[in-house]
Each structure stands twice: as C-alpha cells, then as structure tokens.
Amino acid sequence: MEDETFGVLYVVGTPIGNLKDISLRALEILKSVDLIIAEDTRRTSHLLSYYGISKPMESFNERNSFKKIDNIIERLKSGMKIAQVSDAGMPVISDPGWNLVRRCHEEKIKVEVIPGPSALTSAVAISGFPGTYFYFVGFMPKDKNRRRLLRKIKDNELIERFAFFESPERLKKTLEDIYNILGDCKIFIARELTKLHEEHFYGTVSQAL
C-alpha cells in the first residue's frame, strides 16, 4: 500500500504531433501539479504555452535521470505532486522515466497514469496488420547489432510481426538488412503521424527501397 502522506507521481501522455490530441484529464493534472519533469523542457514549454499553463518545470531525461532521481523522490515524499512527461506520447515507452516509476513503487509512493497518444499503437492501428500479437523492438539498434536482432527474430517462431522506431537517416539501411535477412516481406511505414505532412507506406520491402 502507498503511504498516504506522500505526494503523487503522475505519468502523463502528451500529443505525438497534433497538440489538440491531449485529454481533458491530462490538462487538469498539468494545471494542478506542483512540478512538471520533462524530457526536454523546451518542447514541453511549447505544449504548456499552447494551453496557457504555467508551472515550474525541470528536465528529466536519459542524461540526468539517475543523478536527479533521489531528489525527486524526496520531494514526492514531502507531499509534492509531480507530473512526468516525455517529448511526445507516453513516458517510458522508448523514453526515459522507468527508473523513477520503479523507485516510486519501491518507496510506496503513489503512481497514477494519465493515458494518452502513442506512436506505436497509432501506427499499428492503421497498418493493415493484426494488432493482437506483435513484438515491439523500441528503437532499432545500429549496424551489426541490428542484423543480430533481425536474425534472432527470424529464428523465433513465436514472432510473426514486429514493430520498431527508426530515424529517417537510418531507415534505408534498416530496410536493406530486413530484405537480406527476412526477405521481401510485407511492411508498413508511418511518419509524421497526426501532423500536417503525415505519410504512410504499405507494400513490400523491395517496393520501399
């Protein structure tokens, strides 16, 4: 059981592109908390400004999370209510923050999720592939680690479909590795989801190349 004298960590989902894709509850929480910890305060400032929200904000990301976590835990124990957000989508899903959530569980600090958009589930929903079972890689590794992972996927009979994030700069090399290891399979690619220039591709790897 959580200690009722402690504060609350709110894990808040934010838009993945279109700023209007945010829940009323998320806005209520962001307006009510004592502090917002953000992956990139500049990007989160843009969202808060759009909705007229002014709150103290600090960075909390891969570079500084392990240094800051003890201080954040102490403030939560003092009764503060803190919202954790990422640059886009749900925190922790291929984003920083899992270590803070774990510490809160260990320290009996209440954690509440405020669900929101996810690039992963949004892409799967419009992919044309079944969404009942798939393997999520996260961000695809680079070079030989990528090829090693693809070979493991090929050898695993339980994995029929998989999803991953990739940067535009590395996409071509990743597709070439998929073609060489998994063959000319059907794929779906989405970019700029919910934004003005949203694009999709459905077809084979060779067609994408």
Model segments located where?
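Short glycine-rich anion-binding loops that position phosphate/pyrophosphate groups of nucleotides
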Residues: 16-17, 87-91, 168-170, 193
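Short active-site oxyanion
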Residues: 30-36, 108-111, 161-162
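Loop/turn-to-beta-strand initiation segments
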Residues: 7-9, 79-83, 160-161
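Class I SAM-dependent methyltransferase SAM-binding "motif I" and its flanking Rossmann-like core
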Residues: 99-157
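Conserved helicase motor
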Residues: 59-66, 139-143
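Glycine-rich, flexible N-terminal cofactor/catalytic loop recognition
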Residues: 1-62
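Glycine/small-residue-rich loop that forms an oxyanion/phosphate-binding "nest" at active or ligand-binding sites
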Residues: 69-118
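A contiguous loop/helix-start segment that scaffolds small-molecule binding in enzyme catalytic cores
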Residues: 6, 160-209
